[in-house]
Amino acid sequence: PLLIVGEGPGEREDLTGRPFVGRAGALLDECLAENRITRKHVYITNIVKCRACSSENSRKRNRPPSTAETNACRPYLDRQLEIIRPRVVLCLGSPSANALIHTNFRIMQERGRFFEVPFADYAIAALHPAYILRQGGQAFRDVRATLVADIGAARLKVVEIRKAEAKTLF
């Protein structure tokens, strides 16, 4: 299966206990649909399980998870990887790619490439939907198209792996 790994819960995700249910989730669903994928076809999780936020003028604002927070949640993520046994992991954003592909991952330079990893056949990183939503005009359309393409590449890699497995069965 394909496992999508984001950063961590935002406000809505924290309230519902489900990943990607806010605006970023709606964009993710659109990009999945353009690749003929629904949430029924994938697993979705985050590298941290609690909302990482800071207070600003008595308002909570999302922030990237700290290394300590990522490390504290790693056993839970490792257990999910063990149970799901994904063929391909799609990391959304730098924090996810840093945690799962390699530290110091450079999302703009390395997204869209496949990496061999110990917990799946491959991992690939893509831009996070929340980042895409912060772009405007043509920049929004361009980075959204890269997310659609990266999801498509992940989907095709899963299909390729399944076809190779089917050939070895007979």
PLM regions and their residue ranges:
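A polyanion-binding, active-site-adjacent surface
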Residues: 1-170
